[in-house]
């Protein structure tokens, strides 16, 4: 888990390949269940509809042997936080400047037009939740492979 641009989806793919298991991106799963992309779901039904579907997805994935890349805001729902606490959840964290640079031209409806200000606001809002849920906090700056190695090491330490 982590803020937009932290590398959640990319790192999850690398870890799933390394561990020879499946990978599920909750944003993709939410879009599949909703029948529309996350951006359209937000525009047409609001954030509460997104959070409800995220909670359902996390609940359904709890007992599957897969690497899960969560949406950055999954922690906004108490039920999802409670579920994530039961899993080896890792917080991918890096400087705001890195996050903004990584986002490029992607469509991010929750960020609005001023991405640096939105990232700063989301960090203030979500950091307490990330701290509550995460078993480990990993530096997400660097390449995807470097971050994946850090995550694997953090999970190994947490699980022993």
Positions of predicted regions on the chain:
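Hydrophobic/aromatic beta-strand patches that form the interior of the parallel beta-sheet core
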Residues: 24, 88-90, 136-138
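P-loop (Walker A) phosphate-binding loop of NTP-binding proteins
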Residues: 3
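ATP-dependent small-molecule kinase phosphotransfer cores
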Residues: 22-83, 109
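Short, flexible helix/strand-to-coil boundary loops that buttress conserved ligand/catalytic motifs
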Residues: 34, 42, 54, 62, ...
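A glycine- and Lys/Arg-enriched "phosphate-lid" helix/loop adjacent to the NTP-binding pocket
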Residues: 86-128, 152
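Short glycine-rich anion-binding loops that position phosphate/pyrophosphate groups of nucleotides
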Residues: 72-75, 95-97, 143
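NTP-dependent small-molecule kinase module
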Residues: 10, 14, 18, 101, ...
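Conserved glycine(s) of the Walker
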Residues: 7
């Amino acid at each position: 888990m982590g803020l937009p641009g932290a590398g959640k989806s990319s790192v999850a793919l690398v870890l799933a390949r390394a561990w020879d298991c499946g990978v599920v991106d909750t944003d993709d799963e939410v879009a599949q269940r909703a029948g529309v992309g996350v951006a359209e779901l937000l525009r047409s039904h609001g954030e509460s509809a997104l959070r409800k579907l995220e909670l359902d997805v996390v609940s359904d994935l709890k007992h599957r042997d897969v690497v899960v890349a969560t949406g950055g805001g999954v922690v906004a729902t108490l039920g999802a936080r409670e579920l994530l606490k039961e899993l080896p959840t890792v917080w991918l964290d890096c400087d705001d400047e890195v996050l903004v640079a990584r986002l490029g031209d992607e469509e991010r409806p929750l960020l609005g037009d001023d991405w640096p200000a939105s990232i700063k606001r989301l960090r203030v809002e979500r950091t307490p939740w990330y701290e509550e849920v995460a078993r480990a906090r990993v530096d997400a700056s660097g390449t995807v492979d470097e971050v994946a190695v850090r995550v694997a090491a953090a999970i190994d330490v947490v699980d022993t």
